[in-house]
Amino acid sequence: MTLGDLAFEETGKFAGIRALPDGKVEATYQGTGKLFGADYSSIYTGVATPHGGTLIAEFNGICTTKDGDTIVVWAHGRGRPTGSGLKASWRGGVIWKASSPKFARLNSLPGMWGVGHR
């Protein structure tokens, strides 16, 4: 795999959003997609912190393939608001932890992700 190769593609929606007392926002996201061609479903929970006109987010998740393989996900990123509410353009990094030999190569690959920047 080389820089710029597409490892995964996902679509989904926020399943819940909660404002925290310190101005942060907690969100849960559920999605489906393909990881190296394998279908999977995912769930992530994270916290976004306002910072200098942007949002900084950290979240954890788990992806489960149709074959029952699981991949743990840790990701972080920065979002720039693009309109009202929580709409933002996001970019960030991801680290995977796969226990299945089928996805073991993820354990040595840092990844990048983006939303709303096309």
Which ranges hold each PLM region?
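Beta-strand-enriched cores of mature, soluble protein domains
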Residues: 1-118
